[in-house]
Amino acid sequence: MSDLQKDLADKFYNLLHNKQYERLQFEVDMLGSIQNQHSLVKFYYASSIFLKEASKEKELLLASDLFEEVHLSNKNHLQSLYNMIAVSFKTKVFRKVLPLALKAFEKNPDDTKLIEGIARIHFYLGNRKESIQLFRQLYNKLPDKIEGRFPFVSSLNYSSGISQEEYLKECLEFASLVEKKFNIENDNFKFNNKKNDKIKVAFISADFRTHSVSHFFKGLLKRIDKSKFEIILISNLKILEQDDLSRALMRLANGWYDVAEYSDDDLVTFLRSLNLDILFDLSGFTSGNRFEVIARRCAKVQIEWLGYNNTLGIKNLDYLIADKNLINENEFNLYKEKILFLPKIWNVFAPPEILPDIELEEKNNNTIFTFCSFNNYQKISNRTVNVWSQILKHTNSQLLLKTSHAGDIDDLKNNILDKFINNGVSRDQIIFLKREKEIHDHLKLYNKANIALDTFPYPGVTTSFEAIMMGVPVLTMKGFNMNSRCGESINKNIKMDHLIADNDEDYVKKAISFTKEKNNFEIYGKPLREKALSSPLFDAETFVKDFENLLEQVVDKD
């Protein structure tokens, strides 16, 4: 490197260090084509794109290419590879970075940054076995590591062969690290004993927008008795990401606070100042959670519900809301929280005011039997692929796949498709549908299907409610814990126990049998919608009363 190039590199380093990303990009652009610059200049330029929050996908893909060039010019420059991995989590494009990371890992098997990066890539691609194996390797090397642990713990819900005992053990280990970090045992904060005029209830979530959580939550918020309860929404969603549903929720609540920019300490202080009777966490280990806030006592009573259907393992989370289809009484020791049972179902769906028509003609005119699964692609486990493959190979059928997640792109879809093809399924039998932005258009897609196949061990929830609402029955698998039994509870609440499979063999048998039934359209379709809309699945009025009673009992007990 010449003296001039060194001076430029030092200048660009200082700009990067001072977060002057646009200035850095401007200075480099003035030098001419980025392809003609020194590797270090390329590295700083790409880093400025990655670190700038406003960078668009096209820019991020350029940054990835530049990091790749720098790494290939010097295989020992691992920071460029680390950065390329980090960019891939924003673009969800892994086809180039994964082979490079695996090759580097062969030479650097103890590099924890590579281990974590590859584990997370496998997580996004739905390769649960590989992901969990690498995460375990990472935490064996770094047992006290807290940062970045959420994908590992939450991924245990997606993988077959992970028992509830094993899941709880990992939760307790993670929770103990967080509790030790904040010295929970010696937190002497005392709440104000002054009684609130109404029962003061707050819900914290990053999903107060067009999201499954809000579609379930809105019905409760609309109907809960505001003369008894003061309802406050704590939004961990960036203000720029709020939408029409966010604003609708704002209007229904007594108070709304945007806290995405709050530090954990500031948020704990703020929540405690509200003197809440009850704080609901609607996130668990999912994206946008404030786990390290919930781990500290922020309200007199803290409850987990709706957004995450399993234990979190922390001492300061008092209750987990379920129903008796989800958790058996002899399983209470497998959940850190005390279990609160709602009498019928643990949540209820608020359907759109105007539902699309159920059009059976399209199904009748199709000689090929059509299965569908509109679940998040990451729920399609290897076990699910194996079972579905058996069904597809033994029937004249096709499978429609679609996800409501905007972030799921080609690499994940291609990975799923490869798994089916490797199982002997014809490429033509797997059809990926485009994501529909409008809920009405999304629901109409169910008219293309005869029956919905549920994923396992992580079943669909929103998609099952939607399918049934559109007259499409759902074949689900018997589960072993709260999360994996959600499909069971849904089917039991519409008295369709016959569509709960006992095991893999039974699942295949039931699916194949369904393709041979001639009167499916008379049994399901419009009759199923009518049955469902009058069932506990959509009975918001009764659900809210049961929910209110539960809250009053909790406050009285406290």
Where are these regions (language model features)?
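Short hydrophobic signal-anchor/transmembrane segments that target glycosyltransferases
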Residues: 71, 220-227, 382-396
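Donor-sugar nucleotide-binding helix/loop cap in glycosyltransferases
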Residues: 453, 467
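A conserved nucleotide-sugar
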Residues: 228-232, 389-422
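Short Ser/Thr-rich beta->loop micro-motif in glycosyltransferases that lines
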Residues: 283, 454-460, 478
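Alpha-helical solenoid repeat scaffolds of the TPR/TPR-like class and their adjacent stem/linker regions
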Residues: 1-368, 424-425, 437-449, 463, ...
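Short alpha-helix at the nucleotide-sugar/activated-sugar donor binding site of glycosyltransferases
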Residues: 468-469, 492
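Active-site donor-binding acidic/aromatic loop of nucleotide-activated sugar
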Residues: 258-260, 412, 428-438, 456
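Short hydrophobic beta-strand element within catalytic cores of glycosyltransferases
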Residues: 473-482
